[in-house]
C-alpha cells in the first residue's frame, strides 16, 4: 500500500529531486536521475543524522498547533511556497488522484471539461487559450480568450487572484460526473461576466485536426492543438491523408497550442528534419548543456511513450513535401513546445512563420512521481531552460514571425474552431505567401 507523504520527506525530495512536465516540454524522470542523485532524496535529517530545520518546524506545528494538520494540504502549500521563494511559479504538488488525471491526459485520455489554459499575469486570472473539439466546454459555449476570474458561481464564487493560479487550476480539475463551476470575463474591456456549470466527462483528446483549405484545394491545413502522446500518429495520419488527396502545400496551425510532451514534439519534428539535425538544447542551472538530435527512438512496447517511437526509415519522410512549401501560423498563445516546433522549422528553412509573436516560454518543468519512494502523488518544478537548434532562446521574448499579421478584430472573440477559412485572414495570408 502506498503511504501518504510526510511533510519532512517532501521537503527533502523537493531539495534534491528533478522531475517530469506539463503545459510545456515533458520529460519522464526515472532511473537516470536516481542514479545521479542516489538515495539521498528519500533520507531524513542531515548528514549527522540530526533533525533538520524542516523537521523541527513541521514537528512543532504537528505537536502544538491549535489547528488540525492535513498533510496533503500542507504538501501543496509547501511546494507552492518553495516555488514562490525561488521564483518558480510552475512548482506544484499533485496528490494521487491529480497525478493519475495528469498522466491520463498526457496519453490522450481526458476527464474534465476540455480547455487548455495559461496564467494571465496582467489580470491575475486564468486565460482559456483553446477549447478542445468534442469537449463539454465547447458544448457549453466556453470560448478562447475567456478569462476565468472566479471559481464557482453566485455567492459561492472565489477569486482566482486570491486562490492563486495553481490553487484555482486544481479546483477546475475533477473526474467524470462532477460539476465544474466558474465565472469568466469576456467582451470589450472584459466587462461581461458569464457563469458556467459544466458536467465533467471522459473524452479522447484530438490533438491534431486537418482539412483541405476551402479556398485552395492545393493547400492542406493541419491544426496541432497540443503535443501529447497521441500527436505523432495523428500528425502522420493527417499528412498521409492530405498528400493522398493531392495537396502540395501545408499550413501548420499552432495558434493557441500551449505545448506538451518533449517526446511528442521530438517525434513530430523527426518526420521533417534530417538525421542528426539538432532538435533542442537544454541547460540546467549549472550551465551543463544536453543536445538532442534527430535519430531513431525506441521505447519498450509496454511503455506509453512507445507511441512516440521513431523508426529510422520514418526520419525526414515528409521533408521534401514541406520544405519551402509550408507555413506555421502563430499567435501570442503559441507556447513552449509549440514554440520549439515553430523555431525548428524556421531554423532549418522548412517553413515560413505567419501571424503574431509567440508567448515566449522556454523553460522545462519536470514532474517526478513519488511512487519510487513509497509515497502517493508527484511534485513538479522548473528544471531546465531549453533553446532551439540555431536561434537564440525565446524565453520571455517570443518568436517574431516572418510575416506579421494580426487576426481580424471581428474574429477575436470567435471560437477558433468556428472561424471559416474564408474569414481567417491569417490563414489566407499564409496561403498567399507559400503559393507565390
Task: Give the label of every model feature segment.
Residues 163-210, 382-383:
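PDZ-domain C-terminal substructure recognizer with occasional recognition of PDZ-binding tails
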Residues 1-48, 54, 58, 75, ...:
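Gram-positive cell-envelope targeting signals
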Residues 137-164, 250-253, 353-354:
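Conserved PDZ fold ligand-binding element
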Residues 51-105, 188-189:
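Interdomain regulatory linker/hinge segments that flank or connect interaction modules
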Residues 101, 191-193, 204-208, 259-329, ...:
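Gly/Ser/Thr-rich loop/hinge elements
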Residues 147-183, 233-236, 263-264, 361-372:
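PDZ domains, with a preference for the canonical peptide-binding region formed by the helix
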Residues 88-127, 197:
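PDZ/PDZ-like peptide-tail recognition elements
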Residues 108-153:
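Glycine-rich active-site/cofactor-binding loop and its immediate structural neighborhood
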Amino acid at each position: 500500500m502506498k503511504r501518504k507523504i510526510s511533510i519532512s520527506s517532501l521537503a527533502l525530495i523537493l531539495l534534491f529531486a528533478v522531475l517530469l512536465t506539463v503545459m510545456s516540454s515533458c520529460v519522464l524522470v526515472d532511473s537516470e536521475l536516481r542514479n545521479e542523485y542516489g538515495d539521498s532524496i528519500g533520507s531524513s535529517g542531515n548528514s549527522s543524522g540530526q533533525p533538520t530545520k524542516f523537521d523541527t518546524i513541521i514537528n512543532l506545528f504537528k505537536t502544538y498547533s491549535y489547528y488540525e494538520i492535513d498533510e496533503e494540504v500542507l504538501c501543496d502549500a509547501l511546494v507552492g511556497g518553495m516555488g514562490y521563494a525561488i521564483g518558480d511559479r510552475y512548482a506544484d504538488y499533485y496528490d494521487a488522484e491529480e497525478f493519475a488525471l495528469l498522466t491520463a491526459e498526457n496519453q490522450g485520455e481526458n476527464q474534465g471539461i476540455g480547455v487548455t489554459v495559461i496564467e494571465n499575469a496582467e489580470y491575475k486570472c486564468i486565460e482559456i487559450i483553446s477549447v478542445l473539439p468534442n469537449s463539454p466546454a465547447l458544448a457549453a459555449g466556453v470560448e478562447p480568450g475567456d478569462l476565468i476570474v472566479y471559481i464557482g458561481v453566485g455567492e459561492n464564487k472565489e477569486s482566482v487572484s486570491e486562490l492563486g493560479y495553481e490553487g484555482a487550476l486544481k479546483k477546475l480539475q475533477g473526474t467524470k460526473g462532477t460539476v465544474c463551476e466558474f465565472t469568466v470575463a469576456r467582451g470589450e474591456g472584459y466587462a461581461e461576466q458569464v457563469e458556467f456549470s459544466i458536467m465533467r466527462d471522459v473524452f479522447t483528446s484530438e490533438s491534431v485536426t486537418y482539412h483541405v483549405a476551402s479556398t485552395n484545394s492545393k493547400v492542406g491545413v493541419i491544426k496541432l492543438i497540443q503535443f501529447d502522446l497521441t500527436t505523432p500518429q495523428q500528425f502522420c495520419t493527417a499528412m498521409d491523408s492530405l498528400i493522398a488527396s493531392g495537396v502540395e502545400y501545408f499550413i501548420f496551425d499552432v495558434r493557441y497550442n500551449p505545448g506538451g510532451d518533449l517526446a511528442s514534439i521530438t517525434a513530430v519534428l523527426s518526420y521533417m528534419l534530417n538525421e542528426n539535425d539538432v532538435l533542442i538544447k537544454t541547460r540546467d542551472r549549472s550551465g551543463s548543456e544536453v543536445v538532442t538530435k534527430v535519430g531513431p527512438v525506441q521505447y519498450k512496447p509496454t511503455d506509453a511513450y512507445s507511441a512516440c517511437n521513431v523508426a529510422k526509415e520514418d526520419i525526414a519522410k515528409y521533408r521534401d513535401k514541406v520544405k519551402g512549401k509550408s507555413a506555421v501560423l502563430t499567435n501570442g498563445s503559441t507556447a513552449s513546445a509549440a514554440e520549439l516546433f515553430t523555431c525548428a522549422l524556421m531554423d532549418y528553412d522548412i517553413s515560413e512563420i505567419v501571424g503574431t509573436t509567440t508567448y515566449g516560454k522556454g523553460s522545462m518543468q519536470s514532474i517526478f512521481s513519488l511512487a519510487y519512494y513509497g509515497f502517493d502523488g508527484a511534485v513538479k518544478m522548473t528544471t531546465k531552460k531549453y533553446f532551439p537548434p540555431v536561434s537564440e532562446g525565446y524565453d520571455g521574448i517570443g518568436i517574431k514571425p516572418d510575416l506579421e499579421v494580426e487576426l481580424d478584430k471581428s474574429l477575436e472573440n470567435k471560437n477558433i474552431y468556428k472561424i471559416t477559412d474564408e474569414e481567417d485572414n491569417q490563414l489566407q495570408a499564409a496561403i498567399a505567401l507559400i503559393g507565390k
